[in-house]
Regions:
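Bacterial N-terminal signal peptides that target proteins for export
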Residues: 1-7
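Charge-rich (acidic/polar
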Residues: 21-195
Length: 195
């Protein structure tokens, strides 16, 4: 009798949504990717490559104090950049996109060829090495294109502009808002150039 009462109480207290859940085996992080045209690239990846976007390829520069031209232009008023710096940055961005877009297309084509080879089951060691070399060559060139523009920006930016960029991008704490203990707030703000 106690077991019946316990089961009835459990059934009443269990939400219907819990009872409706049913899984068909373990989910993997790749579930759903089988429907992609190119399994190794999402739709967003392809859009980013086709527009000449960074695709995270320049993080080594970005996170080590070498700003990228696209983000510099987005923040040009807050940094601030002068007209000459804006013109130089725009030229870098234009050059980068001019090179990155066709190279991104090359990477997409290489990943498509790899995808097709596996889909057809026509892969052997030699063809796999060739397909991978083509994809990695495109990716290496694309990464070079993006990273090389980052190290060019620091040639004409002032150190305080780079620091401001890092703060605005969330890579550094804002010294104007985080006054160290023991410092006179007014003097510290003046010393740090806070407005």
């Amino acid at each position: 009798m106690k077991v019946k009462t316990l089961l009835m109480a459990l059934a009443i207290s269990t939400p219907l949504s819990t009872l409706a859940q049913h899984t068909h085996g373990p989910q993997t992080p790749y579930a759903g990717m089988q429907n992609r045209a190119i399994k190794s690239l999402s739709d967003n990846d392809i859009k980013e490559l086709r527009r000449g976007g960074g695709w995270g390829l320049a993080l080594a520069a970005e996170l080590n104090g070498m700003p990228g031209p696209a983000h510099l232009l987005e923040l040009k008023d807050q940094i601030p950049l002068n007209q000459d710096q804006v013109a130089k940055t725009q030229a870098l961005l234009d050059d980068m996109r001019k090179a990155a877009i066709p190279t991104g297309e090359r990477l997409i084509a290489a990943e498509t060829a790899l995808e097709n080879a596996f889909a057809k089951g026509s892969v052997d060691e030699a063809s796999l090495r060739r397909l991978l070399a083509e994809a990695e060559s495109a990716k290496t060139e694309l990464r070079f294109i993006h990273l090389s523009q980052h190290f060019k920006t620091v040639q004409y930016l002032k150190p305080e502009q780079i620091k401001r960029y890092s703060v605005l991008r969330g890579y550094a704490e804002d010294p104007c808002k985080n006054i160290p203990a023991g410092h006179n707030p007014e003097m510290y703000r003046r010393h740090m150039g806070c407005s």
